[in-house]
Regions:
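Conserved beta-strand residues within beta-sheet cores
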Residues: 26-28, 43, 72
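Short coil-to-beta-strand transition motifs
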Residues: 35-42, 68-71
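SH3/SH3-like beta-barrel fold
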Residues: 29, 57-62
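Short, flexible beta-strand-to-coil junctions
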Residues: 32-36, 62-64
Length: 85
């Protein structure tokens, strides 16, 4: 299991996601799926866009073109950083 980095605030995660979107960098994150409570891991995905007011980000899998919209509040780990509110 990779080493955990220091925790970061939700707003810092959103800023980093927006920076990753601008430079088309890949990201890894873990979030809870609201309908079932399952933990979903996205590794090596590209940030397609973000909606600050809506509190969501859309991610693109470069391998197969799958897109997934994630609510920011459900993300609990971003790039090995735990997220706090």
């Amino acid at each position: 299991m990779p080493r955990k980095e220091k925790p970061i605030h939700t707003m810092e995660m959103r800023r980093q996601l927006d920076t990753a979107r601008i430079y088309r960098q890949t990201v890894s994150l873990r979030f809870w799926k609201l309908s079932t409570g399952d933990i979903v891991e996205l590794s090596g995905w590209i940030v397609k866009n973000g909606h600050w007011r809506g509190g969501t980000h859309t991610f693109l899998n470069p391998a197969n073109g799958e897109m997934r919209k994630v609510r920011d509040i459900t993300i609990f780990e971003y790039m090995n950083h735990e997220i706090y509110l």
